[in-house]
């Protein structure tokens, strides 16, 4: 922190504020859902936008409040989390003035009246602050930032009038950026709805409201996966000769039920599934579906399905399972068993129509995927713009 403008100083946090930790509940006491008027603020209540989520706020009884009353936080204090999620910060809303603060956070009580609380909040969002707390954080089972180390954090501090000018610029700029981010996030939600709508139209073209075995067009019929598959099997044990990378001998991919890298965990020398097929995770991320066109070796918790090619299009089934399993039971069952999977009923149109449906869904999903990538990149760009503004602000260049 050099070459700061005239009138700026570099101060340690302990030089400008008393940093006080919160307090855990006394042994045997529990948080309450009913409003006792005595609020207890947890790190779980800290929102990303620098305030407190009031939707699931917890309370304590009056006796507990009296025991903890020395650990109150006020609306002119800044809070910072020091355990678990380190460095999450914000300003207490007026309706929570005087609430009790968790032991996993601290409050800043300013020693002098020449400090803007909002300026300090923006500082805690900056990489200048984040880099310092990362080097000061003790990495254990639950990351912890000691108050003694937090006190040593350095901040570039201009006169109060300049702090307020900087806050005004950042407030206005961040408001515009946040509005753009909000639009992009809504666009992403709209894309998800578009994909679900496309699947709904594809597999329930008559828009029947029945939950199961709804009415189908003429020439369509309900079929179990067992009826339209050449083989459905569960993966075996991981091969003993499995290697992380391809070798001269090991060229066959080994797949598990993971999502990362489409479940690839290594390579072996023999395939147990030769024909084009589909895999679906039976545990963990239930219902994660992949098309496998090359020979491979599936291992435990991964189900493989080889379709009867004369009646079932592999790409059609891919989209169908994404609709019926991922949308339906995927998140609510502990595991997907072979008998349950075999008995799953899907709507089956003639093969040519399956191919047309799959081609249309491919087009829709490719377009939405491209838009998702674009919107996600734009979101990242906006976050980088925020950091750029903060970086300039605390170098005195704004």
Go through each PLM region and give its residues.
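Short, ligand-facing micro-motifs at secondary-structure edges
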Residues: 47-59, 78-81, 85-102, 118-122, ...
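Non-catalytic DNA-recognition/assembly elements of restriction-modification systems
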Residues: 1-24, 152-167, 187, 197, ...
């Amino acid at each position: 922190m050099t070459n700061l403008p005239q009138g700026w100083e570099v101060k340690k946090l302990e030089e400008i504020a008393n940093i006080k930790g919160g307090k855990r509940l006394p042994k045997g006491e529990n948080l309450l859902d009913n409003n006792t008027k005595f609020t207890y603020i947890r790190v779980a209540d800290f929102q990303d936008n620098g305030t407190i989520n009031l939707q699931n706020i917890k309370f304590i009884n009056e006796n507990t409040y009296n025991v903890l009353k020395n650990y109150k936080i006020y609306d002119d204090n800044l809070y910072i989390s020091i355990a678990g999620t380190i460095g999450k910060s914000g300003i207490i809303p007026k309706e929570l003035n005087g609430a009790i603060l968790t032991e996993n956070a601290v409050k800043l009580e300013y020693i002098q009246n020449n400090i803007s609380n909002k300026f300090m909040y923006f500082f805690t969002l900056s990489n200048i602050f984040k880099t310092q707390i990362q080097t000061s954080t003790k990495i254990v089972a639950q990351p912890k930032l000691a108050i003694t180390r937090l006190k040593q954090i350095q901040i570039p501090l201009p006169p109060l009038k300049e702090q307020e000018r900087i806050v005004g610029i950042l407030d206005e700029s961040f408001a515009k950026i946040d509005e753009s981010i909000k639009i992009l996030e809504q666009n992403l939600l709209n894309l998800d709805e578009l994909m679900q709508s496309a699947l709904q139209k594809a597999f329930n073209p008559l828009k029947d409201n029945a939950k199961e075995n709804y009415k189908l067009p003429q020439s369509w019929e309900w079929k179990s996966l067992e009826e339209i598959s050449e083989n459905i099997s569960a993966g075996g044990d991981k091969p003993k000769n499995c290697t992380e990378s391809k070798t001269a001998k090991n060229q066959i991919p080994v797949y598990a039920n993971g999502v990362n890298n489409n479940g690839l965990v290594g390579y072996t020398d023999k395939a147990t599934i030769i024909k084009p097929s589909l895999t679906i995770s039976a545990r963990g991320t239930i219902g994660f579906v992949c098309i496998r066109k090359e020979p491979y070796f599936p291992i435990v918790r991964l189900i493989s399905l080889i379709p009867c090619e004369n009646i079932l299009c592999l790409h059609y089934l891919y989209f169908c399972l994404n609709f019926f399993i991922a949308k339906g039971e995927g998140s609510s069952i502990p595991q997907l068993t072979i008998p349950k999977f075999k008995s799953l009923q899907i709507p089956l149109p003639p093969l040519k129509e399956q191919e047309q449906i799959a081609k249309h869904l491919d087009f829709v999903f490719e377009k939405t995927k491209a838009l998702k990538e674009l919107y996600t990149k734009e979101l990242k760009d906006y976050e980088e713009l925020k950091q750029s503004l903060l970086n300039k602000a605390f170098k005195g260049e704004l």
